[in-house]
């Protein structure tokens, strides 16, 4: 078992038959007009749900969805999720509209084997984001076992993630968190070499802690996306109007020096797709070299950069990908991200994708199925990799006497 799971029980460690299992999931899926647009987080939760059902547990499930301000924000209702779960599980999912009520307590005695309870969006309750012990105790009163399988929310000290397991004796994790931590630990402990971290996205500042943690573990970095312009400017190269964090120029310069001093590699773009504005596809063109004209900004990496990055990725034994290479949501600026996604997919390496934008980029590229693991964690996976303790996991190591 991976190191990060030391002292934490899994759902397999409990006798579930006839027991009320409170299962905290991350069903925070994107929606448009009440329709689910990406159900990955739902399907990722199914193995634990099915296992609990097969073992004869009575299930009370819970999740958050978005950031509702009040209970009247019905666009954040879990109703579409409940309907989708019914289809996927071939079971009746009873949606309890008041998570803070005694309704589950009254429903549980007569719950049939193919019926499950899903609490409405827990963030409709004020006590959830306040880590309220009072709200948690209400749930604990009718629950025998607590299982957290919401990796994407485990970095938040919220009531159903933190306060609830703090008042329950029997607690552990589901299969999704077990897999997530095992995969992320493999990036920190004895990775197959060469090990390359592909970093992209907008800001260097968002990635500093992860870069620092990985610097002693990886063999090389590939840096693309808008954050690359800060590194290029730090080397005195012209980046035009591209997004640059001027307060991070010194850090970027020092980081390059530190990487090279450790005999590790850092690959930066050598050409770009540049244009006059981020929505301006008409003037988009590939630069001849690394320089970007004064009145232009970079929106993607160019073909020479894709070729360089792909050649390095072909040789890799382990790849961690976090962040797109350009504004991939615009098809005109997606070639860099999709080219790198293809190179990662074609590689024989262990390929782990972490961070929300990278997961979306992997999906959009059509290569998601070829990745070893795409983390459902977003912010949680980065916080874990940078060495932060996740409240939702740490509380599971504590024992109630």
From Swiss-Prot:
Protein name listed in UniProt: Phosphoglycerate kinase
Catalysed reactions, semicolon-separated: (2R)-3-phosphoglycerate + ATP = (2R)-3-phospho-glyceroyl phosphate + ADP
Binding site for substrate: 26-28, 41, 64-67, 123, 156
Binding site for ATP: 207, 298, 329, 355-358
UniProt pathway: Carbohydrate degradation; glycolysis; pyruvate from D-glyceraldehyde 3-phosphate: step 2/5
Gene: pgk
EC number(s) from the headed UniProt entry: 2.7.2.3
PANTHER family: PHOSPHOGLYCERATE KINASE (PTHR11406), PHOSPHOGLYCERATE KINASE 1, CHLOROPLASTIC-RELATED (PTHR11406:SF23)
InterPro entries reported for this sequence: Phosphoglycerate_kinase, Phosphoglycerate_kinase_CS, Phosphoglycerate_kinase_N, Phosphoglycerate_kinase_sf
């Amino acid at each position: 078992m991976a190191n990060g799971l030391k002292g934490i029980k899994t759902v397999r460690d409990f006798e579930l038959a006839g027991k009320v299992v409170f299962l905290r999931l991350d069903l925070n899926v994107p929606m448009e007009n009440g329709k689910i647009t990406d159900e990955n987080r739902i399907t990722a939760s199914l193995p634990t749900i099915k296992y609990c059902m097969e073992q004869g547990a009575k299930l009370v499930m819970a999740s958050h969805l978005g950031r509702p301000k009040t209970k009247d924000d019905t666009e954040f209702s879990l109703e579409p999720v409940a309907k989708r779960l019914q289809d996927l599980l071939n079971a009746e999912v009873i949606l309890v509209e008041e998570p803070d009520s005694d309704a589950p307590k009254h429903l549980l005695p007569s719950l049939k084997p193919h019926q499950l309870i899903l609490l409405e969006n827990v963030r409709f309750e004020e006590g959830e984001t306040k880590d309220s012990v009072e709200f948690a105790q209400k749930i604990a009163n009718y629950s025998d076992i607590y299982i957290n399988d919401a990796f994407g929310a485990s970095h938040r000290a919220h009531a159903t993630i933190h306060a609830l397991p703090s008042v329950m004796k029997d607690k552990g994790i589901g299969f999704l968190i077990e897999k997530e931590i095992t995969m992320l630990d493999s990036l920190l402990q004895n990775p197959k070499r060469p090990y390359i971290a592909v970093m992209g996205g907008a800001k260097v500042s968002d990635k500093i802690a992860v870069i620092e943690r990985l610097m002693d573990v990886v063999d090389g970095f590939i840096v693309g996306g808008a954050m690359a312009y800060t590194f290029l400017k730090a080397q005195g190269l012209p980046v035009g109007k591209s997004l640059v964090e001027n307060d991070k120029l010194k850090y970027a310069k020092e980081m390059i020096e530190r990487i090279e001093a450790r005999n590790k590699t850092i690959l930066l773009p050598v050409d770009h797709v540049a244009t006059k504005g981020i929505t301006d596809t008409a003037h988009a063109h590939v630069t001849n070299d690394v320089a970007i004209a004064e009145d232009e900004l970079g929106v993607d990496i160019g073909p020479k950069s894709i070729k360089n990055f792909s050649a390095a990725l072909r040789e890799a034994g382990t790849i961690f990908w976090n962040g797109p290479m350009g504004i991939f949501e615009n098809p005109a600026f997606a070639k860099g991200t999709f080219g790198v996604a293809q190179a990662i997919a074609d590689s024989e390496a262990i390929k782990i994708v972490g961070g929300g934008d990278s997961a979306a980029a992997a999906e959009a590229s059509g290569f998601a199925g070829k990745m070893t693991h795409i983390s459902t964690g977003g912010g949680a996976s980065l916080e874990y990799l940078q060495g932060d303790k996740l409240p939702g996991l740490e509380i599971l190591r504590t024992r109630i006497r």
